[in-house]
Amino acid sequence: MTISYSGNFFRLLLRWKGSIWRSVWRELFLFLFLFYFIRFSAPHFFNYTDPTDSKGYRKIFKVMCNEFHEYTKMIPLTFLLGFYVSNVVSRWWRQFETLRWPEDFLSILCLLLPSKESRPARHQIARYLNLTSALAWRDVSTKIRLRFPSLRNIIDAGLLTEKEYEKLQDINEPSPGIRWLTPLHWVQQLIDAEITAGRGSVNYVSVATNELKAYRISFRRLYCHDWVCVPLVYTQVAALATYSYFFFCLFGRQDLNHDDFYSLDAFFPLFTVVQFLFFVGWFKVGQDLMRPFGLDDDDFELSYILDRNIVTSFTIVDSLQDDDPPKFEEDVFWKHHNEQQQMHQSMFLPRVPTSLKWGRIDLSRNAHKHPPKLHTYLEMKNQDPEEYKNRKNNKFIAW
């Protein structure tokens, strides 16, 4: 589910669910295990294989560590991860924008079919809109698939009837990819039947058709995002650059000066761990957001959105449409209408220009009708330079 958070800085750092600690703790534990294994096993290995250091294994190891440290400077990790994660995050937000809300179309539907005789049609159309969401989302979302493993589960949820199930099965056999589109076609047929029967307003047909088209396009875009992922080679480049960088850090960040006990790196690679949290956590952001319809902490809560849409849809077409609006009652603004009108008119009365420290400013509401003059074009009354030198008290220009 999507993690919402609020609070101060320190409380956010201690959050576990959906945090960087939960994303990278396994990789960080493996990195520290290998790092300390190399640190403690290398001296014992050299003492066992070359006690007198006649073969120069220690020198070769130091040279290799220094070379690996230089290799880490040659990998443009910041550039690769920045470009990779920015594309993934923008794609992640575009996928969220494909989630269409039914209340826009249903509000227009209430204007198109406002009578009480059209209530069964409105109710059926609202159910078909949510049926389309359930059919489409179960193809791309793991949570919706677990909620509706088969179409029989959709029947148990009340979004589908037995006759409609049989029709969907008959349509799905010759054309498997059109099943989610079928309820939207039924919506068009219901609207056409109501208009033909004279129970609808023809003025809103075009607007309702455009909204229904936008509703259908949103699901098609969602399928396109699910079919076409970020290129695999791009993900491989980002993963290879990240993990190879810290492979070189296993050797390049070793403390080779064993006599310096005052160095922090002699006990714990602090800055290397900070880099690991930044870069691996950065890469994990791209990995987690690449497919936001799974079971991760920050994936979209489509099950909640579907429940919310069902409740909202039936409330609009049944309760709100059949309930008359409240009768007019005098409120505070209506009682003081005359006072507000007088106050409103007084705001447009001309005002006397006010002289301020920084110059004369016209505070009149009609000042925008007279474009201001630039001070560079103002005529000087007296062009004698000696007089202006003596006027030391006048420090500001009159605009």
UniProtKB/Swiss-Prot annotation:
It is found in: Cell membrane. It comes from Caenorhabditis elegans. Forms oligomers. This is Bestrophin homolog 9. The keyword Mitochondrion does not apply. The chain crosses the membrane at residues 28-48, 74-93, 232-252, 266-286. Pfam families: Bestrophin. Keywords: Cell membrane, Chloride, Chloride channel, Ion channel, Ion transport, Membrane, Transmembrane, Transmembrane helix, Transport. InterPro entries: Bestrophin, Bestrophin-like. It is a multi-pass membrane protein. Forms chloride channels. One of its GO terms (cellular component) is plasma membrane. Belongs to the anion channel-forming bestrophin (TC 1.A.46) family. Calcium-sensitive chloride channel subfamily. One of its GO terms (molecular function) is chloride channel activity. The keyword Transit peptide does not apply. The gene is best-9.
